[in-house]
């Protein structure tokens, strides 16, 4: 069965994630991380797309992006991942998959929900126990905001970050927030206020992401 085309639109914020094939480690050294970020910069030069937040982890990555034209997210990601796979395999004299498949993405409402997703992304290394403070992870956008050489990759978000943003990122998120975000990641469900979620799901053909998982309950016998 052919894959259905992604329905992504312009000027909508998206969370994007992909993992190494079989969840294997992809980035083994600082050079691996830097090479991927160089490709992100090259992809931005080819297809206009704003990067609001990011976190590269050893076996996966998170991005928060805003495409400028319909379909641009798919074009941008296709170039980024296929180019990375070619260079990765050539460097290691290997063949085969590097990433587990197509990336996952879900749309985000441009309000406090966007800040919630950005916090989730920027504290990823802290949540995984790789650093004591999120800004110490060199491959995440919180470090870049605080003066890293990779600051140039970022675009200012459409809503202003609070002055205590670093402290907010380093503060734990609630279990409800994490559960909602992980559901959106797994089901590619829009993340926002209820009315916006329903409207966006209809507009983008994502109604199935709103349905409950599992079999519908049996109707009582008459």
Placement of each model-derived feature along the sequence:
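Short Pro-Cys-Gly-centered "Cys-loop" motif that presents a nucleophilic cysteine in a tight turn
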Residues: 1-58, 66-222
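Conserved metal-phosphate-binding beta-hairpin within the catalytic cores
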Residues: 63
């Amino acid at each position: 069965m052919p894959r259905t085309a992604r329905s992504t639109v312009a000027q909508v914020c998206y969370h994007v994630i992909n993992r190494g094939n079989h969840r294997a480690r992809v980035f083994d050294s600082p050079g691996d991380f830097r090479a991927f970020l160089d490709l992100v910069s090259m992809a931005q030069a080819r297809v206009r797309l704003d990067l609001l937040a990011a976190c590269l982890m050893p076996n996966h990555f998170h991005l928060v992006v805003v495409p400028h034209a319909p379909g641009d997210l798919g074009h941008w990601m296709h170039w980024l991942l296929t180019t990375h796979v070619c260079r990765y395999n050539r460097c290691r004299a290997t063949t085969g998959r590097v990433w587990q498949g197509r990336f996952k993405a879900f749309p985000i409402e441009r309000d406090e929900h966007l800040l919630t997703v950005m916090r989730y992304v920027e504290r990823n290394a802290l949540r995984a126990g790789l650093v004591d403070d999120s800004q110490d992870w060199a491959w995440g956008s919180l470090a870049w905001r605080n003066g890293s050489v990779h600051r140039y990759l970022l675009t200012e978000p459409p809503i202003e970050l609070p002055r205590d943003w670093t402290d907010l990122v380093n503060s734990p998120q609630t279990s409800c927030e994490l559960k909602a975000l992980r559901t959106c990641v797994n089901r590619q469900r829009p993340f926002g206020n209820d009315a916006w979620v329903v409207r966006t799901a209809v507009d983008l053909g994502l109604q199935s992401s709103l349905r409950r998982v599992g079999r519908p309950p049996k109707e009582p016998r008459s």
